[in-house]
From Swiss-Prot:
Keyword Ribonucleoprotein attributed: no
One CC-aspect GO term: cytoplasm
Protein name: UDP-N-acetylmuramoylalanine--D-glutamate ligase
UniProt GO BP: cell division; cell wall organization; peptidoglycan biosynthetic process; regulation of cell shape
Length: 455
C-alpha cells in the first residue's frame, strides 16, 4: 500500500533509531518533513548530518508553540510519551498522531504481520519466530523493538512474505489501524512504572496488539498467566494458549488450542504434533515457553511442521541470553549478561541442575538477593562478585555458597577457571546493571566472551 504522503507536512518527534527510520521512509515517499528532538547538533552527532542530507528541517530545544498543530501528520518515536501537552494539543487541533509502527504498518498492510509483546522473552520469541518462518522458505522481516525498525521493512514492501515484529507497550500506544495476522502476549509483570499509572494501564497498552484483529486472525497467549488471560477475553480472534502445566489458570477464556510442555519438548495438542527441544540456545523452562509461542505463530501462520522442527533445531540464539560461549576442559561458559535484575537470574538458574559458578554484580537495583540464594541451593557452588554491589551480594550469599570477591570481570573469569571442574558451568548472570564498569549489558557480555575465548 502506498500512502499519499507526497507534499504532506509531517513532523517526526524524536530522533532515536525508530524516528530516524521513519524520517527516511517519509522522505522516500516525498513528504515535507520536520524532525524535532530536544538534543542539539553535538548530541545528535551523525544523526543531525543525516537529517540535513535527507532534506528535512531539524528543530532542537523546546518545542515551538503551534509547531505540531501546523502539521498534516505527527509521527512519534516510541520513547516520546503521547501524553505530552504539545501532542495532546495537536490531536485536539485535528492532526493525526501515529507511532512509527503505525506508519510502517499502513504501508505494509498487504503482508502478513505477526506481532509479539509481553514483559519478558519478546526478543527471543521474535528472533525464534523469524527463524521458523525463514525455515519455511518465507522471505521474513524480523525487527521492530528488536534490531531493525519496522520502517525499514516499509522501504521495500515487495521484499517480504512475512513480518515478525517485536512490539513494546510504548510502540503499541501509537497504533491505530495495525492488524496483526497473529498476535502473541507472552506474559505480564510490573514494568515501566514511570510511564504507566497502574499495572492495569500497562496491560491495556499491551492488549492494543489485538484491538484491530478480526475472526480470521489469531491470538497466542500464556495460559499460565492470569493477567494475560484476562486481557485475552477481549480478543475478537480465536485464542490459542501455551502452558508449562497443561492446566490453564482458573476462569481462562475458551481456548481454540493448547501447546503443552512434555518430556524432551512440547506438543501442539490440537494438531497432534510433537516437537523436540534439544537446542542449547533454547534451554530452560522460559525458553520452552518462548518456543511454544513461536511454534504456534508459525504453524497457525502457515509454516509446515517439518520446517518448524528444523527451525527449532537450527536457531542460533540471541547474544547475552544464556549464550553458550564455549566448553573448555569439560566446563561450559555461559554469557547471560542480559540478566540485569534478580528475576532474570532466577530464570537462568532454573536452566541448570548443579555445578554452577555464578559471576554476579554490577550496579545494583535495590532488590533483595535472597531469592537468588534460595534458587541456587544445591546447584550454585560459588559466587564470584564484581562491581559496585559486590559487598551486598557477598553478605547475601554468606554461609550459602563459596564467595570470592573479584572486583572485575577479568579477575572473576580467571578465578572461575581455577575453581570450575569438569561438568561445571560458569554462568555470567549479574542481576545488576552494567553501568559501573561497562557501557551497557552488551559491552559487558562481549567483554566476557573475549576473556573466555582467550583462556
Amino acid at each position: 500500500m502506498t500512502l499519499a504522503l507526497s507534499g504532506q507536512k509531517v513532523l517526526v518527534f524524536g530522533l532515536a533509531k525508530s524516528g530516524v527510520a521513519a524520517l527516511r521512509l517519509l522522505r522516500q515517499q516525498g513528504a515535507d518533513v520536520t524532525a524535532l528532538d530536544a538534543r542539539g547538533e553535538d548530541a545528535l552527532g551523525a544523526v543531525a548530518h543525516e537529517v540535513k542530507a535527507l532534506g528535512a528541517t531539524r528543530v532542537s530545544g523546546p518545542t515551538p508553540p503551534g509547531l505540531l498543530a501546523s502539521q498534516d501528520l505527527v509521527v512519534v518515536s516510541p520513547g516520546v510519551p503521547l501524553a505530552l501537552p504539545e501532542i495532546q494539543a495537536a490531536r485536539a487541533a485535528g492532526v493525526a498522531v501515529w507511532g512509527e509502527v503505525e506508519l510502517a504498518g499502513r504501508m505494509l498492510s498487504g503482508v502478513p504481520l505477526f506481532g509479539i509483546t509481553g514483559t519478558n522473552g519478546k526478543s527471543t520469541t521474535t528472533a525464534l519466530t523469524g527463524t521458523l518462518f525463514a525455515s519455511g522458505d518465507k522471505r521474513t522481516f524480523v525487527g521492530g523493538n528488536l534490531g531493525r525498525p519496522f520502517s525499514e521493512a516499509a522501504m521495500s514492501p515487495g521484499d517480504w512474505d512475512a513480518l515478525v515484529v517485536e512490539l513494546s507497550s510504548y510502540q503499541l500506544e501509537g497504533i491505530r489501524t495495525l492488524r496483526p495476522r497473529g498476535a502473541a502476549i507472552l506474559n505480564l509483570t510490573p514494568d515501566h512504572i514511570d510511564r504507566y499509572p497502574s499495572h492495569a494501564a500497562y496491560g491495556e497498552a499491551k492488549a492494543r496488539i489485538f484491538q484491530n484483529q478480526q475472526a480470521g486472525d489469531f491470538v497466542v497467549v500464556n495460559a499460565d498467566d492470569a493477567d494475560v488471560l484476562g486481557l485475552a477475553r477481549a480478543a475478537k480472534a480465536p485464542v490459542y494458549g501455551f502452558s508449562l502445566t497443561g492446566k490453564p489458570v482458573a476462569d481462562a477464556p475458551a481456548l481454540a488450542g493448547l501447546a503443552v510442555v512434555e518430556p524432551g519438548g512440547f506438543r501442539l495438542a490440537f494438531l497432534g504434533e510433537h516437537y523436540t527441544l534439544t537446542n542449547r540456545a533454547l534451554r530452560g523452562a522460559h525458553n520452552a515457553q518462548n518456543a511454544m509461542a513461536a511454534a504456534l505463530l508459525a504453524r497457525l501462520g502457515g509454516v509446515a511442521s517439518g520446517a518448524v522442527q528444523a527451525g527449532l533445531d537450527g536457531y542460533p540464539g540471541l547474544p547475552h541470553r544464556l549464550e553458550s560461549v564455549r566448553v573448555l576442559d569439560g566446563v561450559e561458559w555461559v554469557n547471560d549478561s542480559k540478566a540485569t535484575n534478580v528475576d532474570s537470574v532466577l530464570v537462568a538458574l532454573r536452566a541448570f541442575s548443579q555445578g554452577v559458578w555464578l559471576i554476579a554484580g554490577g550496579k545494583g537495583k535495590g532488590a533483595p538477593y535472597a531469592p537468588m540464594v534460595e534458587a541456587g541451593q544445591g546447584k550454585v557452588k560459588g559466587v564470584l562478585t564484581i562491581g559496585d554491589d559486590a559487598d551486598t551480594l557477598a553478605r547475601a550469599y554468606a554461609g550459602a555458597a563459596q564467595v570470592h570477591a573479584c572486583g572485575t570481570l577479568a579477575h572473576a573469569v580467571a578465578r572461575a577457571r581455577e575453581l570450575a571442574e569438569r561438568g561445571d558451568t560458569v554462568l555470567l548472570s549479574p542481576a545488576c546493571a552494567s553501568f559501573d564498569q561497562f557501557k551497557n549489558f552488551e559491552d559487558r557480555g562481549d567483554s566476557f566472551k573475549r576473556l573466555v575465548e582467550a583462556l
